[in-house]
Amino acid sequence: MSSQDPPPATSTQKKQSESLVNLLAEASRFYRKAYNELFSGLITEWEPESSTNIPDYMLFGWHLFLNLRLRSPELFKDLVSCIHGLVAVLAILLVHVPAKFRTFTIEGSSHLIKQTEKGVDLIASLCHNYHTSEECLKEMMDKSHKAIEEVFSMKALSASECKTENLDKIDTDRLMYFKGLIDMECFQSNLEKIEKLCNSNNCEAELDFKLILTNNDYIPCAENLSRDSTNLGCSKCAFETLASPRKTIKNMLTVPSSPLSPTNGCSVKIVQMTPITSAMTTAKWLREVISSLPEKPSSKLQQLMSSCDRDLTYAVTERVSIVLEAIFPTKSSADRGGSLGLNCANAFDTLWADARKMEASKLYYRVLEAICRAELQNSNVNNLTPLLSNERFHRCLIACSADVVLATHKTVIMMFPAVLESAGLTSFDLSKIIENFVRHEETLPRELKRHLNSLEEQILESMAWEKGSSLYNSLIVARPSVASEINRFGLLAESMPSLDDLVARQNIHIEGLPATPSKKRAAGRDDNADPRSPKRPCNESRSPVVEHNLQTPPPKQCHMVLTSLKAKCHPLQSTFASPTVSNPVGGNEKCADVTIQIFFSKILKLAAIRIRNLCERIQYMEQTERVYNVFKQILDQQTTLFFNRHIDQLILCCLYGVAKVCQLELSFREILNNYKKEAQCKPEVFLSIYIGSRNHNGVLISRHVDIITFYNEVFVPAAKPFLVSLISSGTRPEDKKNASGQVPGSPKLSPFPNLPDMSPKKVSASHNVYVSPLRQTKMDLLLSPSSRSFYACIGEGTHAYQSPSKDLAAINSRLNYNGRRVNSRLNFDMVSDSVVAGSLGQPNGGSTSLDPAAAFSPLSKRKPDT
């Protein structure tokens, strides 16, 4: 690479660029739909017939929005700001576009229903239609007016001073008018000028923003908007391929209709909850419920903090300022010696970042007070000092509040888990606060509950098992038998950075706080951390909330069941205690023991649901419990199989292993073909599985293999005892009838020699190479009777048969595959409220079923939520 070549884009930069494309595509879809509701699709008199059939007025408004976006950086950071900008553009078009191009008349219009004494209130009507904030919309219109003045050298006039047909019966008090902006004589030149300006100032030169508007392939279809789109992720590098993001902009929620409206008695149409409506609905909640709260802790919360062993009010408020400044830095990278650009996560616009910090802090104080009130009602809590002085607890709650705010605005430049990295946390840390957050914020919209549920699933299935997760710091205490493996692969998390470290990292100075490091600020370990704690003092234990939505822990030992039953009494403060600290209500057990039991219970619940769904899809429901039991035993006794891996990889292997020992007609290919239909499927789960080992020099090396190789080399040796137990327990009828002393599961001995297979074919004239099909008789000879039932043979493919030419091409493509990364992402299907409640906690505090096996019950049709 030459010195002038730009550095290769990181995965984070690519992810942000992909998300930007999806955001703009969704914004353009909203704009086209709104424009077509307000204006006719007729082309102007001077507009030539084009292949795109995009009216020039629509194109002019789109370029005006793009120019506004370039001038105001906050417009490209989240979907809510984009919608406010586009609604401002629509207001300007309504003022300037000739009235004959409207689809409505002012009298009795359903589009403009807000009235004043002077006529229709245009801004209030648009805010009502599109759930926007009048204050934000006014700010956007002011920015748009300034942009028009600078671009076209025009002076804004008060609309009340202008006499034009467009403004008839409209209240013009708060509106501005530009003479000549869309007049016939100069409109074409104005359109060309602003389009040229947008192209020349486009810092994302790879993207054709006009194509995003004009190409229908860029516009996500409403029918496809059925899955989660909190992060607006894309399954492939859209900013490079310019592919349609239709299948990747997903929303997991559809608002069902009620049979009859109680007000008018008419049937109500089903409302499709798109990313736009979802974002505007949650933004309305944030604006009306959270933003109206006081900036500082309430008097009740201040009383609770001051009543501790020492007054913690200053420490709490100082921490909020520092952590939120680290998450939403207002200093650009240029100020720190870096460079600005689209993908710079530290280039937050000051006004935008300050608004997000204010929202997150208010939400944090609100939930913190609710948690404190609930803890005081716990019979085991008579002092809030341990909880309110716990650094990790506060950071997790702050990070969760910030993530909810970002999810509300559909932000693309700061995505999960970037919030955790900025706060010095790991995903396992966040998993301990999610349920408490949802339980104690009763007004949280359903969309945000589903967002947090999807985060919890991501953490459980893979993120918590990644290298550097604080899970291993608890696991090494709770399961000493895996300590050597954890240390061998260097899986332990680093110490949590202190607040001073965050200040130094961001080079920030909080107004009103001392510029010098404060001795009160937390260091890497918490104030109540045990000095014998491992490398990273991960302070977690059982939460009283978790009990209500978890299945009973696996009954591998009696004391685990007893512990789980009495865990309802565990105070939240023990959840964040150091792993080596004794559980205050658990006798001789450590906090790490209870923490791992809780986490494993969540894993088992998620696995039970996925095993049931997969077995039902394959139509082997009778094997569901066996697969689950094998998975449960592996999680308990072969926990190292999960290190650096995805739980679906173990589920697939368990299913195939059970099928082998039970002699079912089920191949890996069939399992994978059905797994690909699952909502959470992504190709790298079965194409790239981590295997770590040391070479002859003792150097740790890692390689990634497909699932069949992993199954044969790693899974079978570790899981064989559990699979053998299925045979010994009589899983097959013929096993019970076997009286010959033969190894169960082995083929019957035959008195005749095996018949030869077909004559092999010579495949090369110059080489003595012959190829013949792999027959069952050959397979029987290659594998011993005791092991034949466990292994997968090479003849079993992971892809469905197509044709010889296509299969050979696919083989060559895989042989030439140089990278591990598979362009895909997790998409979470819509889940029922019962599943969400089971994972996040019942709103009324009730408990759910305590048996994970309950997930095996046959699926029944779920009625839509009303």
UniProtKB/Swiss-Prot annotation:
Transmembrane segments: none annotated. The keyword ATP-binding does not apply. One of its GO terms (cellular component) is nucleus. GO terms for biological process: cell differentiation; negative regulation of G1/S transition of mitotic cell cycle; regulation of transcription by RNA polymerase II. SUPFAM superfamilies: Cyclin-like. Residues 274-475 are annotated as: Domain A. Residues 594-721 are annotated as: Domain B. It is found in: Nucleus. Ubiquitous. Residues 274-721 are annotated as: Pocket. GO terms for molecular function: RNA polymerase II transcription regulatory region sequence-specific DNA binding. Residues 476-593 are annotated as: Spacer. Keywords: Cell cycle, Nucleus, Repressor, Transcription, Transcription regulation. Residues 523-539 have a biased composition (Basic and acidic residues). It holds the Pfam family DUF3452. Residues 513-551, 731-754, 839-866 are annotated as: Disordered. SMART domains: RB_A. Residues 841-850 have a biased composition (Polar residues). Belongs to the retinoblastoma protein (RB) family. PANTHER family: RETINOBLASTOMA-ASSOCIATED PROTEIN RB -RELATED (PTHR13742), RETINOBLASTOMA-RELATED PROTEIN 2 (PTHR13742:SF22). Regulator of biological processes that recruits a histone deacetylase to control gene transcription. May play a role in the entry into mitosis, negatively regulating the cell proliferation. Formation of stable complexes with geminiviridae replication-associated proteins may create a cellular environment which favors viral DNA replication. This is Retinoblastoma-related protein 2. It comes from Zea mays (Maize). The gene is RBR2.
